[in-house]
Design a protein with these regions (language model features):
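Append "and, occasionally, other polyanion-binding protein interfaces
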Residues: 2-117
């Protein structure tokens, strides 16, 4: 299976929601995550649905869902590589490392506090 980031970027652009991040900033986070996923697993990230792309884009600027949807980001896109690196360095049982896992629950919040505080 080959992951086509250009096609992913086109789909993302077509469904991109209002966000404190630009499309390019969000795509840079996705690209970094997908590169680390391939490095970690040895295979490309599986495709994700447009609805999942929208949810991730909506959540990305905010550490906690409680405060999501505002005009100002809680976390800058430039902070994501450190969080993603820490995520892949953490051992999880029965985890496929899909980006949906990274953006679920409080995982990013915990990595944020571990890495940046």
């Amino acid at each position: 299976m080959i992951f086509d980031f250009d096609k992913f970027a086109q789909i993302t652009a077509s469904v991109y929601p209002v966000s404190p991040y630009t499309l390019e900033e969000s795509l840079s986070v996705f690209r970094y995550y997908f590169e680390k996923y391939k490095e970690y697993t040895g295979r490309p990230h599986p495709p994700i649905r447009a609805s999942q792309i929208v949810r991730v884009c909506q959540d990305m600027p905010f550490i906690s869902r409680e405060y999501s949807g505002g005009l100002y980001a809680d976390i800058e896109p430039e902070a994501y590589p450190a969080l993603i690196d820490r995520y892949f360095a953490t051992k999880y049982r029965n985890c496929d490392r899909n980006i949906n896992h990274f953006f679920s629950g409080r995982i990013r919040e915990m990595k944020f506090y571990e890495e940046l505080y």
